[in-house]
Amino acid sequence: MAKHHPLTDWLPTSKKEMEAKGWDEADVILFSGDAYVDHPSFGAAVVGRILEAEGLRVAIVPQPNWRDDLRDFRKLGRPRLFFGVSAGAMDSMVNKYTANRRLRSEDAYTPDRRSDMRPDYPTIVYTRILKELFPDVPVIVGGIEASLRRLTHYDYWQDKLLPGILYQSGADLLIYGMGELPLHEIAQRLIAGEPFDSLKSIRQIAYLVPKGKTPVPCENDRHLFSHEECLSDKRKQAQNFREIEIQSNRYEADRILQAVGDSTIVVNPPFPPMSTAQIDQSFDLPYTRLPHPRYKGKIISAYEMIKHSVNVHRGCFGGCAFCTISAHQGKFIASRSEASVLREVKEITEMEDFKGYLSDVGGPSANMYKMQGYDLSICKRCKKPSCIHPNVCPNLNADHRPLLDLLRRIDKNPKIKKSFIGSGVRMDLLLHNYKDKVLKKAADEYTEDLIVKHVSGRLKVAPEHSSDRVLNLMRKPPFRQFAEFTKRFQRINEAHGLRQQLIPYFISSHPGCTEEDMAELAILTKKLDFKLEQIQDFTPTPMTLATEMYYTGYHPYTLQPVYTAIKKEEKMRQHMFFFWYKREEADKIRRELHRIGRPDLIAKLFDRTTSSRNDRHTPPSTQPRKSKSKSRHS
């Protein structure tokens, strides 16, 4: 039976709601670029519930108006301890603009998808306003925008290097990564009466100090090239990124320092990966799992997408060059207990609009639940950004049995008709030739269960490209694995009398990719009988390897030059190869193949005899039909 929630079950968003709780002031006031949804997938709710669990009174101002007399920033008054600021669940510029730098018409994190409810760079805008209105109140920033912009970074939308967001915003502290552990310690210290300045010794915190007044040196401090040096030398920016990524992926990282202007940014090492008990505690907080009643009658699309889904772990050890997950969540997996997951599933089944279908049981990648190194002492010495590229690490315990057991226990709930896996699946973990027969059997069982029991007719996978040279730059497995997985998908479908579809995702204009590579991609996918729809142009986002290659023109680990399509016309020429089957693109593609000196590819691409409809190895069941674009994980 659905539970009725009184208004006081949510964090207060107005003075009236604070009074209903008997408060005359809040200890902490949060400002968020997203609508307030009280759910563990929405960062402001998580931060608020964590601080509330520490005994603090927390209020939230979602999507404040920054263009009027700033009454939204004043309405709850001055907090006793600090303001917290987050741009929201996405970097605001990714949220607001397309890969072509055009303003998006919709915002999934805003009621009724309105696109005018947040500024560019809310972290900076909100913080500057708060500092102007309440100059003596500390401001702590966090969330993915602040986290991935904590040091000098390339901003695609301004097409230039920007300094760390602390320097731009004037915030007092920055929490990077997932915030539960630093927030717990911040709350404990402030409740104990320690001064705000003492917080600078906490792990996973970044802060500014005047140049020349750096904190007591640590034995292994990592001093980056200054922001100004990076502005004058792109190779230095590339070298900086290499050090940042190495430290981001270490179990026990070093402190990072970078000079900018008259200040130095200090980034303390992160906390160790969360334990199962710690991550359970975060997910088990008393969320209503609903949007705030202020949005009654309005639709928040991001919530609609995830309201019947369950996140079972955090972190990803894939290390994809274009992905920010490992930079923000880390490469070490933090998994929830079965008991915690099953409690959440039970809560979902009791929701009024639940019809028996879980939309996703997954995480950043679908199949990494409870995976870690056999010998953690080896992991603690490791500096590699990926545990599976170029090969699966022999120290990785990639056992799919815990995930299989969890899925089967979920499906035993009598109110569950079907549990889907909507997160992206790592094919390389399923196809790896495990020496341990138990691991091989478990991977095969998971593959079959996935295809037979957990697919809604369409399985999303992300080969991303067909060129092994480009895939190596992406830190993705070779294309032959996609062909192998396609055959396995076909065999399992045939064995069970199913006609499901495989939906591959591809990227154009990734660093290292040429028009010739795109032509080869078109030919290979044609042979596999795919007419691609789920495609995207590469968008540089802060703190990824691919973005550094795009901006600097060098690979940060080798300092060798890397070609990248930068100009709009170059990117469009690559993108059109996805649509070789459209009549209006065919002549353009023919002309382009002549221009790049590869007319020999024309026959392979447009000769009907090369169609894979004559290839008995690829049945119609793998032919994707036209569909609306969906978000995906790498």
From Swiss-Prot:
Its cofactor is [4Fe-4S] cluster. InterPro entries: Elp3/MiaA/NifB-like_rSAM, Methylthiotransferase_CS, rSAM, rSAM_horseshoe, UPF0313, UPF0313_C, UPF0313_N. Disulfide bonds: none annotated. Residues 625-634 have a biased composition (Basic residues). It holds the Pfam family Radical_SAM_N. [4Fe-4S] cluster binds at residues 316, 320, 323. Gene3D superfamilies: tm_1862 like domain. SMART domains: Elp3. This is UPF0313 protein PG_0934. It comes from Porphyromonas gingivalis (strain ATCC BAA-308 / W83).
